[in-house]
Amino acid sequence: MFKKIFIIITSFIFFSTALSEEIFLSLKKDKVNVRYGPSFEFPVKFVYKKIDLPIKQIDKKENWRRIKDFKNNSGWIHSSQLKRINSTIPLNDKILFDKPTIFSKPVAKIKKGRVLIVQDCQNNWCEVKTDNFKGWIENSNLWGEVK
């Protein structure tokens, strides 16, 4: 009896943890079609034109992923257009620093909505890079995967 209860409780904890995990992916190309449904037969809803843009997977069906972006736009993207890379978007303007402290040298001002590639995270800071800059940013008000 105890063994059955233990198995049920363990299964419940495992499945609830697995279901609550957020999955973030990034766009593989600089032009990605988002469709109304999970098939090439569905019309294109809109087109992303930002490589590495972080998106959140909210459902999947075969090779299709239902996604949501930081502006709450949603639709279906074929899995061949997605990749696993830690990218993030600041939800407000931020300062990029040379080291993970506000007392270090400011490197650049990062505008809201700019795609950043996450290199490393320590405490409340993430080391990120853009096309032009590399440095540390506080990880508050970031949308995407920050690990």
Where do the language-model regions lie?
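A cross-kingdom feature marking solvent-exposed beta-strand/loop segments within repeated
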Residues: 38-40
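SH3-family beta-barrel domains
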Residues: 19-36, 46-51, 56-132, 139-147
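Sec-dependent N-terminal signal peptides
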Residues: 4-15
